[in-house]
Each structure stands twice: as structure tokens, then as C-alpha cells.
């Protein structure tokens, strides 16, 4: 007769031979890739940040129309001989901007504005290459985390669209016999607006990759809905103000009225509605465009205070600090905007004003992110 089966001993012995469970193994497997992708996105963020600044300087130096053709590939090489430089100069001499306002230019002067525009376009090519190499590398090595293929591809598509919109903008100013000396302001606003959208998505993805997927899932459960909703509204309102700022830059409206708080001694400028049909004034009248930018700024800072009052009620220190940073940056931006007007929008102040707009934009995104994914702290504050 066989001996009784030692059921519990056999089970215990079998269990002893199995490897111990390792919690978080799947997350650890992808953590290295998440960190690498985050570094790649941080590089892209820095490049786009610089691109926005260079684009602003290109506009402020009236360099944007110096290259009259769009050659995405062959245009990567600048003129390499005197004959090539002469050819580029002759193309520029044929457009209205030169004939109307820049006939004084010699070759040396033309080269200055040409290098600004060439550098702006070249930086765009560099951004495209950095995106393509990074995306291709992670794709081939199968290191893209689940759910991220579409997000990273979307950035590339936005970048391609930005290049096309850039030429669409420039083409509006490369005219002959039409009396046009600048690009269309609404196209400039579209171009700048998309740049902020691209930068915003990159910043958001960087913040997402800065924390593990389980951590984000856990944080989502303690989402602060009021702060999230109000910061979303502030983000959209700020974007509107950025577009209005682009309209101001597009028609040099910042130099049309240099007093504050009034405009030419009036609360509402007398030149605001002089164009026909009337809708043109909202895009082309320096008086009305600057007036809209000013009034929107006043309302925006008031709304920022309201959002901050709600944000400071958050139970999470990191979230409260994020809203404090938003209020501080927005206040500084309003003050800088007034200074820009009073000094007639000189290039160095105007570019600082635009750069600070980027910082405000990112800080609002961070406050919104922390409202949706709070960083929980213990009673001890750790």
C-alpha cells in the first residue's frame, strides 16, 4: 500500500523552486526607454524654444522676405559664390519690399537679412532631422512605449505642417506690383500659434514621461477638477492673447501708439476703424489691433488672479507652487508689455516680451498638468 500523499509538502517544495514575484517588472522594462525619449524631447523643446526666438528676431529685423523661394532640400546650402549671392540679391530686388522701402540696400546689407532668414529656415531643418532620427531610432529598436507611437508621430506631422505654413506666410509678402511690404498678419499669427502648439505638446509629453505610468494612473484618481478646468480656460485665453500679439508684430502695431494707459490721448484710438470693409480693421488696423491686445491683457491678468485664488486652495504643495509661478510670470509679462509700448517696441524688449510669453505658456501647462496629475505628499511632507 502506497504512502499517503504529502500534499502540502509538495506544494510548498514546488513553490520554493519558483522565482519570487517582482512587482513593477513591466514598468522597469520600459523605464529606460521613457527616460531616453524624454531626453530626446527635451532637446526638441530647446530647439523649438530657440526657433521661436529666432523667428521673432527675423521678424523684428525685417529679414523674412530676403529668401524669395521655398526649397526645402536644396535651400539648405547658402550662396557659395559672388555670382550666387548676386542672383539671390536680384530676386529680392524684384519684390515690392525692396522697391518700396529697401532700395538703399547694398549687397552687404542684403547679406545681413539673408543670413537671418537662412538661419531661421536652417534651424527648422535641424529640428526636422532631430525628430526623424530620434523617432526612427526608437521605432527600429522597438523602444516606444505602448500608446506613444501616435503621439511622437503627431509631433513630426505638426512640424511638417509648420514648414508648409511658414512658406504660405512668406509667399504672402513675396509680391511684385501689389504694394505689399510685409507678410499677411493673420498668416504670421497662424505660424506663431502653431509654434506654441508644438512647444506645448512637447512640454506636456516631457511632463508625462517624467513620471511612471502607474504613478500617473494613481495621480489621476486625485485629480483636482476645478483647478484643471480653470487652468484649461487660462491656457486657451493666453493662446488668444499670443495670437493677438502676433497680429501686433505683423503690422508693427506696437509702434503706432507709445503712450499708456491711453492711446494717443484717447481711451479708444480714433484710427481704429478707418479701413473698409470693417472686418479688415481687426487684422490690419494698428490702432484697433493694439487696442485689442491691451484690453485682452487687462482681462487676462484679472482672470489669472481668479485662477490663482483657486489654485492656491489645492491640497498639494507642488500644485500651489505651480499656480504661484503662473501669477508671477503673468504679472511680469503685463508689466513688460507696458514697457514695450512706452519705448516703442525696440527689438531687444520686444523679443524679451515674446520669450516671456513662451515661459508663461509652459508654466500654465505645468499648473494644468499638476492639477490633473497631482504629486501626492505624505503628512510628513515627503
UniProtKB/Swiss-Prot annotation:
It is found in: Cell membrane. One of its GO terms (molecular function) is oxidoreductase activity, acting on NAD(P)H, heme protein as acceptor. Keywords: Cell membrane, Heme biosynthesis, Iron, Membrane, Metal-binding, Oxidoreductase, Transmembrane, Transmembrane helix. It is a multi-pass membrane protein. Pathway: Porphyrin-containing compound metabolism; heme A biosynthesis; heme A from heme O: step 1/1. InterPro entries: COX15/CtaA_fam, HemA_synt_rhodobact, HemeA_Synthase_type2. Heme binds at residues 293, 353. It holds the Pfam family COX15-CtaA. Its EC number is 1.17.99.9. Its cofactor is heme b. It catalyses: Fe(II)-heme o + 2 A + H2O = Fe(II)-heme a + 2 AH2. GO terms for biological process: heme A biosynthetic process. The chain crosses the membrane at residues 37-57, 126-146, 152-172, 188-208, 231-251, 288-308, 332-352, 356-376. The keyword Isomerase does not apply. It comes from the Bacteria. GO terms for cellular component: plasma membrane. It is an enzyme of class 1 (oxidoreductase). The keyword Iron-sulfur does not apply. Coiled coil: none annotated. Belongs to the COX15/CtaA family. Type 2 subfamily. Interacts with CtaB. Catalyzes the conversion of heme O to heme A by two successive hydroxylations of the methyl group at C8. The first hydroxylation forms heme I, the second hydroxylation results in an unstable dihydroxymethyl group, which spontaneously dehydrates, resulting in the formyl group of heme A. This is Heme A synthase. It comes from Roseobacter denitrificans (strain ATCC 33942 / OCh 114) (Erythrobacter sp. (strain OCh 114)). The gene is ctaA.
